[in-house]
A protein has these predicted regions:
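Conserved SAM/SAH cofactor-binding pocket of Class I
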Residues: 1-73
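Conserved SAM-binding loop
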Residues: 20, 92, 119
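A short acidic, Gly/Pro-enriched loop at the edge of an enzyme's catalytic core
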Residues: 76-90
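A short SAM/SAH-binding and catalytic strip from SAM-dependent methyltransferases
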Residues: 89-102
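A short glycine-rich, Lys/Arg-flanked "PGG" loop and its adjoining helix->strand segment in the class I
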Residues: 101-116, 131
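ADP-ribose/adenylate-binding Rossmann-like module
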Residues: 114-127
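Core SAM-dependent methyltransferase catalytic element
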Residues: 139-158
């Protein structure tokens, strides 16, 4: 339940706006419920039309417009990237390395200049491949954290 938990913590730590995205409708719904249980929303589920009639995005609009969740796959649905926008100070991906690697190719589309891309949930066997993908896509690695077999990278777009 990465996006939901991370966005709740970010909001509680002072982020003025957070947006979570997931390809699993249940994860999006539970993220919205978790945000509500933490006092971050007015439990309203909306639907936003996608690029075609068969492709809708479920959106949880939160109280204060400070927290939201989209059902989308940013890797295979370029139209969802337009909806999510490009003005984020931090982009976080807590998911498998096999998703982080292609995500590193498009992460900058969401980021302000100087923003950070934090990737975590990376098993040691894939850590070097993620590092290489970040560097190949123009990121500067500013921090590496290892906890047992798991890695996290904090990177800034050059």
């Amino acid at each position: 339940m990465g996006a939901g938990i991370l966005s709740i913590v970010a909001r509680k730590l002072g982020a003025s706006f957070v947006m979570g995205t997931d390809i699993d409708e249940n994860a999006v719904n539970v993220s919205g419920e978790n945000a509500c249980q933490n006092g971050l929303c007015a439990a309203t589920a909306l639907t936003m039309p996608g690029a075609d009639e068969d492709n809708d995005y479920t959106v949880f609009e939160m109280a204060e417009k400070g927290c939201g969740y989209y059902l989308s796959n940013v890797l295979s649905e370029p139209e969802s990237r337009v909806i999510l926008g490009n003005d984020y100070d931090v982009v976080v991906a807590n998911i498998l390395a096999d998703v982080i690697i292609p995500l590193s190719e498009i992460a900058e589309e969401f980021m302000k200049p100087g923003a950070l891309f934090i990737s975590s949930g990376i098993i040691y066997l894939k850590a070097e491949a993620v590092k290489e993908a970040l560097l190949a896509n123009g990121f500067e690695i500013v921090e590496v954290t290892q906890m047992g077999d798991w890695f996290s990278y904090v990177a800034r777009k050059n």
